[in-house]
Amino acid sequence: NGPMIIIAGAGSGKTRVLTYRIAHLMNQGVDSFNILSLTFTNKAAREMKERIASVVGTAEAKNLWMGTFHSVFARILRSEADNLGFPSNFTIYDTQDSVRLLSSIIKEMNLEKDKYKPKQVLGRISQFKNSLITVKAYFNNSDLIEADKMANRPKMGEIYHHYVNRCFKAGAMDFDDLLLRTNELLTRFPEVLAKYQDRFRYIL
């Protein structure tokens, strides 16, 4: 009962260890409702859930929250979206949706396409979001602003601002938002954080 990290190479049995750790917890009386398991791929999540069900039974495993970081965070956000001003049925933009929106924004801002290529701009925005850098945080970070000026893209902050606003107005999030918005949710709303802390006693 405490933090633990397992470091091992591919095919060495990490998934098996996690699977049997979860099954052991459940056999010791821990309710599957109180267990959260995060994986990097949907395939791994499916395989783990099937293995656990084969050990403890399908009925026992049904309340287990298991999935990729993105799928689990999307599930949390759909339950709590109203706190952030989003509908519970918000749209999740894929890369093509995001590139299309950025192309429109870049055109509306009359920016040179050679300097602001939509896919590259999206990559930069993705870097911001995965570093938990919001639009406000960007404009408060002189190093980021200077870096974009040096890279000949001084309007990056404005594009980011418009992109976030347009997504919000459309009731949409992109894949990176699933991480950024969940962080925002749990940071801004302590009662929501407490709710999930109380529920998930074991996170693997």
Region roles according to the model:
Residues 60-63, 82-177:
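ATP-hydrolysis module of ASCE/P-loop NTPase motor domains
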